[in-house]
Design a protein with these regions (language model features):
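Active-site regions of metal-assisted phosphoester/phosphodiester hydrolases
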Residues: 1-30, 34, 87-283
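Metal-dependent catalytic neighborhoods of phosphoester/phosphodiester hydrolases
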Residues: 16, 40-81, 98-102, 192-203
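Acidic beta-strand-to-loop metal/phosphate-binding motif
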Residues: 35-39
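Cysteine-dense, low-complexity repeat segments
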Residues: 79, 83-89
Length: 283
């Protein structure tokens, strides 16, 4: 099984149409079984898409934000379908981003989706508050595993600290871990290199970093330098890179490889984050 995660930055990216096409071509080549995306945007007030055009989309219970014409997840799923690669997909919007976008998260799956859910992680639930955060998860058919796309707050945020959001995730998945593996995919907003903060909090809770489990891995760096959200938090503005995008599993899964993708080496850069692609199974 191949699993991909990427903080897309989507519509906020310069040269967005070109980067959308590059991303689609990457997915067509690699064909991940599961794709977890963060910062999946659409323009506030753009035309709403008719339900019959949302091919493959599974609605999220309780979701109120409609899918609009320039929705990034819709664009990706639609382009893949036109190229002959079908994905089932889920999107939820939960806050205003950059003062002009419905910002949300998405998951795409090659397998049909049996269950989907979204839970509030932040203490605030205000659509106009950029600190509002949710987790979006699904279970594929014929599987007891759950997969969640996450975009966490910062460890030292006085209003919405990482630890409180992490405790809410733990409560969400507690029962599910008894029946199958749970996978957390996304932007954890905490460098793996920093001790005593976000990364160590997750690890101390018994979760397994698939990067460390991988038989074959690279440097894991998913952010070069200081990007949006980190410029006021990194003392050294010339920092070379951080491993803040991670894939965690509740069990010690067999991971064949973990590699950074869409980083300008083998693949073009499409976001201010690079992606992570893991492949499960024995080497």
């Amino acid at each position: 099984m191949k699993i991909l995660t990427l903080n897309t930055h989507s519509l906020q990216e310069s040269y967005y149409p070109e980067k959308l096409e590059w991303f689609v071509q990457f997915v067509l080549r690699e064909q991940p079984d599961i794709i977890a995306l963060q910062e999946v945007n659409q323009t506030v007030g753009a035309r709403r898409i008719r339900a019959d055009r949302l091919v493959g989309m599974v609605p999220v219970p309780g979701a109120e934000t409609p899918v609009r014409e320039d929705n990034h997840a819709f664009a990706v799923a639609n382009a893949l379908r036109r190229s002959g690669l079908e994905y089932h997909w889920v999107w939820i919007g939960f806050k205003i981003g950059y003062d002009k976008y419905d910002e949300g998260m998405a998951i795409l799956s090659r397998q049909p989706i049996a269950e989907v859910e979204s839970h509030l992680l932040s203490s605030c639930d205000d659509y106009r508050n950029w600190r509002t955060r949710r987790v979006l998860g699904f279970r594929p058919v014929y599987s007891t595993d759950w997969f969640y796309t996450v975009h966490m707050g910062w460890w030292q945020d006085a209003e919405e600290p990482f630890r409180a959001q992490w405790e809410r995730i733990e409560a969400v998945v507690r029962e599910k871990k008894k029946h199958g593996a749970v996978w957390l995919l996304g932007d954890f907003n905490g460098p793996a290199e920093v001790r005593g903060e976000s990364y160590d909090c997750v690890k101390a809770a018994g979760w397994c970093d698939t990067y460390l489990l991988a038989a074959d891995r690279d440097d894991g760096i998913t952010v070069e330098g200081a990007i949006d959200g980190w410029r006021d938090k990194v003392a050294d503005q010339n920092v070379s890179g951080m491993r803040i995008d991670q894939i965690w599993c509740s069990e010690k899964a067999a991971i064949r490889s973990s590699r950074v993708v869409l980083n300008g080496k083998r693949d073009p850069v499409v976001s201010d984050h690079y992606g992570i692609l893991i492949e499960t199974g024995e080497q």
